[in-house]
UniProtKB/Swiss-Prot annotation:
The active site is at D143. Optimum temperature is 50 degrees Celsius. It is stable below 50 degrees Celsius. It catalyses: 2-O-(4-deoxy-beta-L-threo-hex-4-enopyranuronosyl)-alpha-L-rhamnose + H2O = 5-dehydro-4-deoxy-D-glucuronate + L-rhamnopyranose. GO terms for cellular component: cytoplasm. The gene is yteR. Optimum pH is 4.0. This is Unsaturated rhamnogalacturonyl hydrolase YteR. It comes from Bacillus subtilis (strain 168). Keywords: Cytoplasm, Glycosidase, Hydrolase.
């Protein structure tokens, strides 16, 4: 089992995932999950993690918590209120697929259909790339691949809407075309086709920095989306290669001391840069899933083990009242310059990072178990 066989002074990854999920579920009712009473990707990412926990443990309370959130916002006819001008609104729809599979309640399919309709009305670049939001015209962000990609593929498989496969392939190819940096192999956070944003490079339109979480959303998307394509689809091979190349590039910038990654990935030598938890978790998820699915070489277990140990040692703690805490999670962030990113607020148990942490731990668990720990 490679490097995961090494003796590690931490518990099972699933133990930590449950500790964090239980802490947040004990802190917030589904009505209170921030931003309260909204169909939003913050809750969506966290609840995707909670549903993975349900699948891993069989504990029904995890399923019921996610279901209660959906039932709070979806009425008897499958109606729900969501922002109709942004990709972010779609991501929480990922929870609808396991809810429907388990309950066969058609409300969840109707709600998914409403979210799916958004693809037909979103504004696009000249090449057909979705604007991230109407508030950010002509811009594609790496985040958008996760916000809209996995849902589209799952919906395509549920309803046999094969055109959605081509849609996601196009979106990913455009992001890669416009944001990949040939020198580092990393992807810039955003691209402005109009080149009007203050941060936009006057030649390429790219934002100037490699933001950890945005790259994390991207590699997690790839790791999840490969298996959603038809088995003989040519882009399975393309996405595997892209994932392999991105992980290879990301791992060059892993902090040697902690095993984690910096808020601005390639500038760990700057004193005001800092090790960020959510991006580190998303990289761990993508690496673990890549190993589990055979997309990545098992040699990456060394990288994974170092990150796992560093995350638990440096970014988690248990409070006096028994709450499990994950620290140094960057709050919601737009595209910008270096100073903007490194000055962003650092949160504890923010749902971005909580969801990423739980997803990473559940994906790590099979490797941990196979090592006999």
């Amino acid at each position: 089992m490679g490097s995961m066989d090494q003796s590690i002074a931490v518990k099972s990854p699933l133990t930590y995932a449950e500790a964090l999920a239980n802490t947040i579920m004990n802190t917030y009712t589904v009505e209170e999950l921030p931003p309260a009473n909204r169909w939003h990707y913050h809750q969506g990412v966290f609840l995707c993690g909670v549903l993975r926990l349900w699948e891993a443990t069989g504990e029904k309370r995890y399923f019921e918590y996610a279901k209660a959130y959906a039932d709070l916002l979806i009425d008897d006819n499958g109606n729900l209120l969501f922002r109709r001008d942004e990709l972010d609104a779609i991501q929480a729809g990922l929870i609808l697929f396991p809810l429907y599979e388990q309950t066969k309640d058609e409300r969840y399919v109707k709600a998914a259909k409403r979210l799916r309709s958004l693809y037909g009305t979103l504004n696009r670049t000249s090449e057909g790339g979705f604007w991230h939001k109407d508030g950010y015209p002509y811009q594609m962000w790496l985040d958008g691949l996760y916000m809209g990609g996995p849902f589209a593929l799952k919906y395509a498989n549920l309803k046999q809407e094969t055109e959605l496969f081509d849609q996601v392939v196009l979106q990913e190819s455009l992001m890669r075309k416009h944001t990949k940096d040939a020198k580092t192999g990393l992807f810039y956070h955003a691209w402005d086709e109009a080149k009007k944003m203050p941060w936009a490079n006057e030649e390429t339109g790219c934002s100037p920095e490699f933001w950890a979480r945005s790259i994390g959303w991207y590699v997690m998307s790839l790791a999840d989306m490969i298996e959603e394509l038809p088995k003989k689809h040519p882009n399975r091979h393309v996405w595997k290669n892209t994932l392999q190349d991105m992980i290879k590039s990301i791992c060059r910038y892993q902090d040697k001391e902690t095993g984690l990654w910096y808020q601005i990935v390639d500038k760990g030598d700057r004193s005001d840069n800092w090790l960020e938890s959510s991006g580190s978790c998303l990289y761990m998820y993508a690496i673990a899933k890549g190993i589990n699915k055979g997309y990545l070489d098992r040699a990456y277990e060394t990288t994974l083990l170092k990150a796992y140990q560093g995350l638990i040692q440096h970014k988690t703690e248990t409070s006096e009242d028994g709450a499990f805490l994950v620290k140094d999670i960057c709050v919601g962030t737009s595209a910008g310059f270096y100073d903007y990113y490194v000055s962003r607020e650092r949160s504890t148990n923010d749902l971005h990072g909580a969801g990423a942490f739980i997803l990473a731990m559940t994906e790590l668990e099979p490797l941990f178990r196979s090592a006999g720990k």
